[in-house]
A protein has these predicted regions:
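C-terminal long alpha-helix characteristic of the crotonase
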Residues: 33, 85, 163-168, 219-266, ...
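Terminal peptide-recognition signature
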Residues: 39, 43, 57-58, 76, ...
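Short loop-to-helix capping motifs
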Residues: 43-44, 242, 291
Length: 303
């Protein structure tokens, strides 16, 4: 019996995408599309390390999920196992073979010799972090193997994390390769596990099991590997059974105090949308269009 948590019979590829480094699926039950999508790194032979092209695809599909009004939850994971050694990985961070002095470089192949010198290096995995953070729907990270370096930071920025009991390994390798995630990957991680554990994770760069990360507070649940995506779909189903507006407001409320004016703007934007839905707001709009004074007399000043 396969222990691969991915069951292709439950998923359907999302049309309109020509992807090489990422897969993008919609959950289906009896042929009916469900409000959960699955986004996965698809470079298992290199522990799902990302290159600029990978990040381009990842951003595109996540943004599509963000703008799909019938999608409520995003699952983010990595495909596997590796065809080389059978190992599992969620994401092992940036592909160091094509890292240049200005960031990760576009390349036609897999090595430094194939880098395109005319294109600037990129660090746009940080844009993906912000997209996950600002997306008005929960993103659940499924750590089915290694979450290292930039992959560790991606797990940290997701709303929830489920981890494989047998194969999940967490390791923050940034300082080993002269890199550092000075934003969500570190400071927000410290909000989850506390300052002492966060500094240990970064300063020592040791590997941690799913159980250890759960004890620290960075993993929501430790799940048998073969059941990882089944459990994730159950969590997604429970979330999708809640009010979409409430889920949006809750995510932005949790984010607000750490995200400054941007966090305030996102929360306030959803509050504005709620206001637009009221009779009071309709009266204000109609009075403007009809060139008359608004009549607020029927609207109480609540306290």
């Amino acid at each position: 019996v396969s222990d691969n948590p991915f069951d292709p019979s439950q998923w359907q590829s999302v049309d309109g995408f020509d992807l090489t480094d990422i897969t993008y699926h919609r959950h289906v039950v009896d042929g009916v599309r469900q409000p959960t999508v699955r986004v996965a790194f698809d470079r298992p032979e290199v522990r799902n390390a990302f290159r600029p092209h990978t990040v381009d695809e990842l951003y595109r599909v996540l943004d599509h999920a963000r703008m799909s009004s019938d999608v409520g939850v995003v699952l983010l994971t990595g495909n596997g196992p590796s065809p080389k050694d059978g190992g599992w990985a969620f994401c092992s961070g940036g592909d160091q073979r094509i890292r240049g002095r200005s960031g990760y470089q576009y390349a036609s192949g897999e090595t430094a010799e194939t880098v395109d010198p005319a294109r600037a290096g990129r660090l746009h995995i940080l844009e993906v972090q912000r997209l996950i953070r600002f997306m008005p729907k929960p993103v659940i990270c499924l750590v089915n193997g290694w979450a290292a370096g930039g992959g560790h930071s991606l797990h940290a920025v997701c709303d929830l994390t489920l981890a494989s009991r047998e194969h999940a390994k967490f390791k923050q390798t940034d300082a080993d390769v002269g890199s550092f995630d000075g934003g969500y990957g570190s400071a927000y991680l410290a909000k989850q596990v506390g300052q002492k554990f966060a500094r240990e994770i970064f300063f020592l760069g040791r590997p941690y099991t799913a159980e250890q990360m759960h004890a620290m507070g960075a993993v929501n649940a430790v799940v048998d590997h073969a059941e990882l995506e089944t459990v994730a779909l159950q969590w997604a189903s429970e979330i999708n059974g809640k009010s979409p507006q409430a889920i949006r407001m809750l995510k932005y409320a949790f984010n607000l105090t750490d995200d400054g004016l941007v966090g305030q703007q996102l929360f306030a934007g959803e509050a504005t949308r709620l206001a637009y839905m009221t009779d009071e707001a309709v009266e204000g709009r109609d009075a403007f269009l009809e060139k008359r004074d608004p009549d607020w007399s029927s609207f109480p000043r609540y306290f």
